[in-house]
């Protein structure tokens, strides 16, 4: 089940509400990534406390470990991981195509060697839909080929991007057919591909629109292309997506990317950046980024961001976070992750409020000025 209510707009920016089988998601929203069924360093309780409405799980990795038998014994991913709110699962396609020489692509699907134990495995649109049905995720993604930005060290040609996109379209129909055959009560999103070529993106969207997906994602961005190319494609595709369906930008990105995405008409985002950067001591704040390992923070008694209400900023100094990072304490990674995810989710809250009050352009200007100011 999916119901999307478009509450209001401000330019191309959209304030919406997505109702799914496990709850309501206020949009625009950021989805923390829980690759193996866990958002790294965070408990479900902590995710609730910082305002996460929905998290992302990885079909490919959960299929390999712990395996579908284990998840099925818990009647799905929600009970297995102790999370009672919505979950989106990707199709596994991106991970398979990231294996490079370890995989072989045909019209049927992808044959590859398991990165866990080397076993020969096969993943197809049908198998991806079956796995995601067992996981019982609220939002299922079609199986697609993520068109690479580079092939053999050069930009993908129009012909290469077209071939890849058209196979993804054929796989989209097979995904839709299998989703319906399984009588899956959840939602299925199609993925717009086409590389850096606007005409191919238009062709992809036209083909997907005929299949009547519950929502639409923009794939194949943030895969190594220059930022200006990413923004060019994003600003071309997002306003053309069906207005009455949710819009999801996959795997993006920085705080600046989220604001630009919302301005273009995107409702949903996911990225490992806030969690991965947190573990590496790279912290996002309203006034720019903090690299906590730097010696400048050794004796700094201030919080990361005095305007931030997260547990980390309310209780600990930059000096303590610097110390934890330098000595490799696990608590450092946890406190950093709490802060970064809180910052991302607070940013989304502020954008929702700005759109509601039709002052998104003012918000965007202030956001850019604050981030450019830098931390003192």
UniProtKB/Swiss-Prot annotation:
Pfam families registered for this protein in UniProt: TGT
**Residues that, per the record, bind substrate:** 90-94, 144, 193, 220
Q: Which residues take part in binding Zn(2+)?
A: 308, 310, 313, 339
Q: Kindly list the cysteine pairs connected by disulfide bridges.
A: none
Its protein name is: Queuine tRNA-ribosyltransferase
What does the subunit section of this Swiss-Prot or TrEMBL entry state?
Answer: Homodimer. Within each dimer, one monomer is responsible for RNA recognition and catalysis, while the other monomer binds to the replacement base PreQ1.
**How are cofactors bound according to the entry's free-text note?**
Binds 1 zinc ion per subunit.
- Where is the region RNA binding? 251-257, 275-279
**Where does the source fall among the domains of life?**
Bacteria
One GO term describing the cellular component = cytosol
Q: Which reaction does it catalyse?
A: 7-aminomethyl-7-carbaguanine + guanosine(34) in tRNA = 7-aminomethyl-7-carbaguanosine(34) in tRNA + guanine
Question: Which EC numbers does the record give?
Answer: 2.4.2.29
**Residue numbers annotated as active site:** 90, 270
Pathway stated in the Swiss-Prot or TrEMBL entry: tRNA modification; tRNA-queuosine biosynthesis
User: Enzyme group, top EC level?
Assistant: transferase
Show the GO MF annotations: metal ion binding; tRNA-guanosine(34) queuine transglycosylase activity
Keywords (A to Z) from UniProt: Glycosyltransferase, Metal-binding, Queuosine biosynthesis, Transferase, tRNA processing, Zinc
Names of required cofactors? Zn(2+)
Per the record, the similarity remark reads: Belongs to the queuine tRNA-ribosyltransferase family.
The biological process GO terms on file are: queuosine biosynthetic process; tRNA wobble guanine modification; tRNA-guanine transglycosylation
InterPro entries (UniProt xref): ArchSynthase1/Queuine_TRR, TGT, TGT-like_sf, tRNA_ribo_trans-like
* Source organism of the structure: Cupriavidus necator (strain ATCC 17699 / DSM 428 / KCTC 22496 / NCIMB 10442 / H16 / Stanier 337)
Q: What does this protein do?
A: Catalyzes the base-exchange of a guanine (G) residue with the queuine precursor 7-aminomethyl-7-deazaguanine (PreQ1) at position 34 (anticodon wobble position) in tRNAs with GU(N) anticodons (tRNA-Asp, -Asn, -His and -Tyr). Catalysis occurs through a double-displacement mechanism. The nucleophile active site attacks the C1' of nucleotide 34 to detach the guanine base from the RNA, forming a covalent enzyme-RNA intermediate. The proton acceptor active site deprotonates the incoming PreQ1, allowing a nucleophilic attack on the C1' of the ribose to form the product.
């Amino acid at each position: 089940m999916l119901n999307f209510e478009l509450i209001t707009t401000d330019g191309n920016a959209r304030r919406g509400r997505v109702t799914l089988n496990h709850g309501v998601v206020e949009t625009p929203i950021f989805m923390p990534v829980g690759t193996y069924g866990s958002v790294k360093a965070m408990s479900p309780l902590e995710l609730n406390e910082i305002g996460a409405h929905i998290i992302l799980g990885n079909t490919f990795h959960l299929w390999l470990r712990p395996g579908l038998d284990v998840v099925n014994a818990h009647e799905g991913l929600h009970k297995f991981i102790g999370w009672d709110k919505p979950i989106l699962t990707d199709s596994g396609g991106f991970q398979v195509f990231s294996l490079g020489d370890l995989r072989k692509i045909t019209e049927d699907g992808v044959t590859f060697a398991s990165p866990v134990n080397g076993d020969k495995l096969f993943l197809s649109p049908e198998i991806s839909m079956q796995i995601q049905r067992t996981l019982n995720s609220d939002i299922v993604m079609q199986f697609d080929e993520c068109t690479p930005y580079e092939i053999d060290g050069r930009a993908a040609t129009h012909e290469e991007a077209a071939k890849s996109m058209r196979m993804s379209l054929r796989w989209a129909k097979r995904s839709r057919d299998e989703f319906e055959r399984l009588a899956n009560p959840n939602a299925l999103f199609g993925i717009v591909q086409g590389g850096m070529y606007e005409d191919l993106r238009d062709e992809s969207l036209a083909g997907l629109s005929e299949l009547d997906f519950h929502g639409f994602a923009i794939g194949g961005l943030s895969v190594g292309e220059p930022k200006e190319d990413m923004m060019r494609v994003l600003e071309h595709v997002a306003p053309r997506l069906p207005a009455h369906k949710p819009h999801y930008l996959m795997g993006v990105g920085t705080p600046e990317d989220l604001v630009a995405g919302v301005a273009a008409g995107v409702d949903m985002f996911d990225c490992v950046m806030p969690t991965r950067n947190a573990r590496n001591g790279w912290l996002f704040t309203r006034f720019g980024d903090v690299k906590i390992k730097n010696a400048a923070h050794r004796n700094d008694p201030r919080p990361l961001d005095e305007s931030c209400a997260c547990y980390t900023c309310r209780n600990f100094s930059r000096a303590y976070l610097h110390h934890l990072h330098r000595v490799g304490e696990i608590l450092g990674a946890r406190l950093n992750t709490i802060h970064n995810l809180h910052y991302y989710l607070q940013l989304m809250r502020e954008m929702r409020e700005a759109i509601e009050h039709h002052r998104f352009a003012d918000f965007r200007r202030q956001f850019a000025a604050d981030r450019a100011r830098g931390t003192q």
